[in-house]
Amino acid sequence: MSSLPADSRIDFAGSPRPTVGVEWEFALVDAKTRELSNEAAAVIAEIGENPHVHKELLRNTVEIVTGICENSGEAMGDLCDTLSTVRRAVRGRGMELFCAGTHPFGKWSAAQLTDAPRYAELIKRTQWWGRQMLIWGVHVHVGVSSAHKVMPIISSLLNQYPHLLALSASSPFWDGEDTGYASNRAMMFQQLPTAGLPFQFQTWHEFEGFVHDQKKTGIIDHLSEIRWDIRPSPQLGTVEVRIFDGVSNVRELSALVALTHCLIVDLDRRLDAGEQLPVMPPWHVQENKWRAARYGLDAVIILDADSNERLVTEDLDDLLNHLEPVAASLHCADELAAVEDIYRLGGSYQRQRRVAEENDGDLREVVDALIGELEL
């Protein structure tokens, strides 16, 4: 790659320790009808200035975020403190908090856009697809010490993309219909320009060159407009994993955060040991994303560049065993072990379908069940 202008350099803050942070998106639903409610602005105004409560693209959404935490357990404590504050304000206005990748019968046409120039510009550019973004997710940040590690970690972490998506898949329904997918959200979000799978760069210089080209050609104005499923967060000094569908309860969220934390720290330590991290051809990565979105925990995934395949839950058994020493060092062994409960007991998309079947297809009961899970 040719040399870049000096102003194209992107400074990566770097994290002295492998800390973790979480962003958790919630929808607001009417307590009686279970329909989405566009009252986020009023809720946030009532709560007042709070760095842990954010607005999002749609006025039916509130996001809560942690500070800088050492492990999953600390992050859950941070989130739960904020969650209790937000829930009081929400319930005081006749609403409930709901979290899944999609709302089972929500109508995108009824959603209102949050008043902010960047959101208006997004919809102006993306039009119909942008207005379809009636979706919710979880983002996990893990601190990385230096820029040269970031792209190798991201490129190798894509090997575990289907594991993370299958475990969190919680969006089988769209506009009142069963889509046949475990994660319809994953299929929807990638329709936005600059969203979807990251390019498998190996150096920070390649990433800087990509961003330079994106800005020069008017594709983006700001780095935050790169909406990859896994991306660098240079200001925070983190790798940000954005694969997860919305997670409806603290128990599963804690497990998924621990898994993400351990995966990235494991890759980081392997780099320190001089290992060249494994990567797969992008066509395998793309296929794995689709298989996990379609089949969830029943997906047979591609494991490596040699095209070997295996049931994702069987591979998770070995992955969890491999990560046990990392989890012990990060003081999240119990949280990592709880990952197994998700695929042994059933994922969110499976629970939602079961509730719908048991209630003659009444999707309000699905919303009720998900609201109830947040109490756990």
Curated annotation (Swiss-Prot):
Any GO molecular function: ATP binding
Entry EC no(s): 6.3.2.2
InterPro entries tied to this protein: GCL_type2/YbdK_subfam, GCS2, Gln_synth/guanido_kin_cat_dom, YbdK
Reaction(s) catalysed (UniProt annotation): L-cysteine + L-glutamate + ATP = gamma-L-glutamyl-L-cysteine + ADP + phosphate + H(+)
Role: ATP-dependent carboxylate-amine ligase which exhibits weak glutamate--cysteine ligase activity.
Family under the similarity heading: Belongs to the glutamate--cysteine ligase type 2 family. YbdK subfamily.
Name this polypeptide is given: Putative glutamate--cysteine ligase 2-1
Species the sequence originates in: Mycolicibacterium smegmatis (strain ATCC 700084 / mc(2)155)
